[in-house]
A protein has these predicted regions:
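N-terminal hydrophobic/helix-forming segments and targeting peptides
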Residues: 1-190
Length: 190
């Protein structure tokens, strides 16, 4: 946030946001310690394009990804343990206590295995056999701004999934994970 470049929310010339909250909650200032207050756009998602082929919405990558993962999770029939996690704070680097870079998932999985009376070695073997996918949206190549995209990686809209990778491991993709995803896509004609 840069105070010189970003808009400060103004809700009233008479009362501050804090005063409005106190009034709405009917509490005194001494009972108000702190809060996380997030403002967001309230526009509904819209189908756009001359053929109605585009969906325009805020946070679309996260919503579409979460929906696809949840749908697959619910409709997959096998007896293996399945875990899905939807982390918060992806847009700010996942560095919060509830973000993907936190200890939350590690601690939850350890507690589950502890409750199942698994030894530490059994827990580690289970983790080693697991497969992790980090889901995010990839920016499609805009025909009006070709120069803004890497010429070696043109991402076509509506042509399937994109697997992101980075030599500095900016993404969760490994060579093994890439191969598994590619085989899954080929097996399912994606």
């Amino acid at each position: 946030y840069d105070a010189h470049e970003h808009i400060i929310i103004i809700t009233s010339l008479q009362k501050s946001i804090k005063e409005k909250i106190l009034e709405k909650l009917q509490i005194s200032e001494k009972d108000f310690l702190s809060c996380d207050l997030i403002f967001t756009a309230s526009e509904q998602a819209k189908i756009i394009g001359s053929e109605g082929e585009f969906l325009a919405s805020k946070n679309l990558d996260n919503k579409a990804g979460c929906h696809a993962i949840m749908n697959a999770f619910v409709h997959t029939n096998h007896n293996r343990n399945k875990v899905i996690v939807f982390f918060d704070n992806e847009e700010i680097g996942s560095l919060t206590s509830r973000g993907a870079n936190s200890k939350l998932l590690t601690e939850v999985l350890e507690r589950i295995d502890h409750a199942l009376n698994l030894e530490k070695e059994e827990h580690l073997i289970k983790l080693n056999k697991s497969f992790n996918i980090s889901m995010d949206g990839a920016h499609g190549t805009h025909p009006g701004y070709i120069e803004k995209h890497d010429p070696n990686y043109q991402i076509a809209l509506g042509k399937g999934i994109t697997i992101k990778s980075n030599a500095n491991f900016k993404y969760a993709t490994t060579a093994n994970g890439y191969a598994k995803l590619k085989l899954l896509a080929m097996k399912n004609n994606i």
